[in-house]
């Protein structure tokens, strides 16, 4: 009987890996098995020992198909996913009937997460890809980095933005002429470089004959318990659509649901997420020092009843100070990668095939999916009304 259990678990693991095209390490990371996870998976798969009941249950519950594989024949519109990260912007547009015909992401760990969840490997550095290599499409999506324009406002042509990643968006808009676009950035973009960066972006989008509007939206207003304010720029091709001078894009106002941190917390959390005595004492000491020096307030502590957390960023993996969770009779703990995924509105069937450190970076760099979903609905509705 014992041998049968080993055979069953080894076959189960092998089948899961084969169906999802996962390496031993990718499956171990996705299951949260820690530093010895890959070795354990390899041993179990080869019939040496077997996982305990808790891990076996995790393996049994694990996906057997690519979670977000798109329908390549039945679709309503097409889009491309630039600076794609792990696909947070893609998910809602695909849900609404869109087909992704091209994606680009340079980070190899994000590429891995993207491939495993969507069944496609993004192209690499967009600066090395010619517009002619990109299929025609209807909507451009991109969460681009905020960079200064060295000569912003001094020229009348497109030299203002050359050498920045926004230039790559501009180049593709000019060459491919999609019907619409959605860009996402940090809310500080508006004030970056004294406002020159934002005004240059909007000026150049206008020069390309796109009607563009921008608005800062807060994730907590869209059903996820995280403040996370971001700026969203929506644009439509004026040469294709008759857009009145007084037109205002109907940015969504939110969904009105009250949020609570407890809604995204896992029930059974590994002790490894509890911060050490040394780190906790350091957090408290720095908080006192920062208050004295007027440099901010240091760590942020939340519990299940808190309406929302502060914004998680790519640096969350370092010490978790942005959002620590209270625990009874213990030091506080960091959010788990799955909790970070939920904080951004990612579905629970989204696979996390990387280490905790990489997962924190990926979700910290990603978007609040529910915000994108509501913007996408408004965009598609407007385009359908015009066509």
Task: Identify what each model region corresponds to.
Residues 1-20:
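A short, Lys/Arg-rich alpha-helix, primarily the initiator
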Residues 12, 23-26, 55:
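Residues that mark the N-terminal boundary/hinge immediately upstream of a DNA-recognition element
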Residues 27, 33, 38-39, 278-387:
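C-terminal target-recognition/interaction regions appended to catalytic cores
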Residues 65-177, 187-190, 196:
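Core alpha/beta nucleotide-donor-binding catalytic domains of modification enzymes
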Residues 129-139, 147-317:
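Class I S-adenosyl-L-methionine
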């Amino acid at each position: 009987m014992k041998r049968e259990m080993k055979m069953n678990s080894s076959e189960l693991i092998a089948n899961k890996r084969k169906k999802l095209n996962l390496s031993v390490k990718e499956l171990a990371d996705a299951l949260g098995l820690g530093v010895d996870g890959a070795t354990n998976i390899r041993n179990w798969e080869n019939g040496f020992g077997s996982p305990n009941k808790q891990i076996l249950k995790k393996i049994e519950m694990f996906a057997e198909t690519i979670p977000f594989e798109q329908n390549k024949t039945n679709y309503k519109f097409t889009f491309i996913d630039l600076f794609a990260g792990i696909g947070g912007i893609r998910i809602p547009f695909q849900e609404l009937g869109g087909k992704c015909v091209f994606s680009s992401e340079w980070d190899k760990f994000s590429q891995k997460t993207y491939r495993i969840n969507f069944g496609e490997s993004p192209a690499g550095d967009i600066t090395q890809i010619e517009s002619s290599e990109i299929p025609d499409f209807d909507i451009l999506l991109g969460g681009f980095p905020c960079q200064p324009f060295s000569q912003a406002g001094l020229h009348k042509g497109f030299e203002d933005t050359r050498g920045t990643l926004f230039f790559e968006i501009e180049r593709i808009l000019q060459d491919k002429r999609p019907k619409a676009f959605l860009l996402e950035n940090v809310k500080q973009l508006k004030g970056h470089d004294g406002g020159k960066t934002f005004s240059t972006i909007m000026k150049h989008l206008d020069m390309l004959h796109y009607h563009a509007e921008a608005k800062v939206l807060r994730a907590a207003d869209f059903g996820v318990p995280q403040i996370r304010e971001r700026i969203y720029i929506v644009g439509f091709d004026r040469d294709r659509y008759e857009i009145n001078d007084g037109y205002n894009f109907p940015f969504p106002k939110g969904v009105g649901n009250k949020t609570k941190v407890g809604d995204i917390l896992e029930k059974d959390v590994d002790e490894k997420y509890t911060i050490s005595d040394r780190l906790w004492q350091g957090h408290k000491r720095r908080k006192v020092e920062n208050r004295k020096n007027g440099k901010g307030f240091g760590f942020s502590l939340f519990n299940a009843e808190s309406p929302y957390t502060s914004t998680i960023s790519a640096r969350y993996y370092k010490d978790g100070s942005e959002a620590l969770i209270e625990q009874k009779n213990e030091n506080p703990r960091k959010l788990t990668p799955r909790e970070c995924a939920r904080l951004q509105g990612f579905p629970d069937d989204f696979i996390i095939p990387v280490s905790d450190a990489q997962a924190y970076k990926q979700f910290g760099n990603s978007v609040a999916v529910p915000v994108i979903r509501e913007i996408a609905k408004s965009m598609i509705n407007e385009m359908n009304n015009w066509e």
